[in-house]
Amino acid sequence: MNFRGNHDLRRAGGILQGQRGTKSSGTLENTLCDNLSEKGDHLISHMASPVPADPSAFVSSQELERHIASIEQQVERPIEGIFGPNSITWRINRESALFLGAGRAALLQLAHPWVATALDQHSSLLSKPIARFHSTFRVVFTMIFGTAPQAFRAARSLYQTHTRITGQLPTDVAGYAAGSRYEALQMPALTWVYATLIESAIIAYECVLPRLTPTDREAYYTESKIMAGLFGIAPDTLPPDWTSFQAYIRQMLESQELGVSDRSRIMAHRILTGAGSWVPIPRWYQSLTTEILPSRFRTEFGLSFGEARMASAERARRWLPHVYATLPAAMRYVGPFQEAQARLANKPAGFIARRSNKFWIGQPLLPFNE
């Protein structure tokens, strides 16, 4: 692989090998969605840490099976899944409000040249964005709310899908040269995708619900490492705690590991406008997504954020918590969570759960049953 950003990689090792980054006053604990006047940069400000050390590191099927075996040993009741109803993972991911962070997570994933090129060349993101949305959430929600066997089958299915995703970068992007080879099982890209999902979920949650305590945030991050194992990422290679995780994100956002190409810019604009789908994207959602993006990527994606957009995002932050608080549980909680609740009560998923599942995962029940 022809990689031009090796100076960033040589600084690797500290955070991902268990060393803490330097902490300062600007942490996620002090900011997030209800204090976004700094437009996304404060979300991970004043932190510095290394990025993944080895761009040639890959996930093997043997490693994935080791992670699955390790998780399986910790599961007490397989019917409850790998997290269970008392976990903070269920508490956060049951909220439909997490959709508020989906655009942000998607754009930050597109900021990784390997991920963006893989999505462009191997997915239906542009032609069938709803199908892509459903395929992503089918896997993620099954890992979270399915039974343990379902979660493990989802992990193996995802791995098999990733084995077929290879190619070359068509142009120079950030620290990568044209012709550089990518594979979906490369650890740095998988780690970045995982990180965007975890961070964006908390940002979205706190847009409409009370801010998580530092203890809860730490617990959520700790539990998230279990799901990382289902991606094939060894938990002990991840930052050891939430503060270090912030530091890793900060380093990534400032590094040449990330960069936006013309093609990924087009993909991002299509996502934010709902092009190719029957679902219109509200202006307020576009504005809020733009606001909670780090300023570097607002610029690189070519997203305008003038006074009108700022006002739109500000209004959304004011009314969203009030509207969300009035939603009945059937609308507030995602279908996969409702299905899991029914399963634990030894009942079939009800009509509302099935309809909600159709929206979130494109089918009435979680997949990967025997």
Predicted regions and their residues:
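Short hydrophobic alpha-helical segments enriched in small aliphatic residues
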Residues: D8, T31-D34
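Short linear motifs in low-complexity or flexible loops
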Residues: A12, T22-T27, S37
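Mature, function-bearing regions of proteins
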Residues: L32, G40-E370
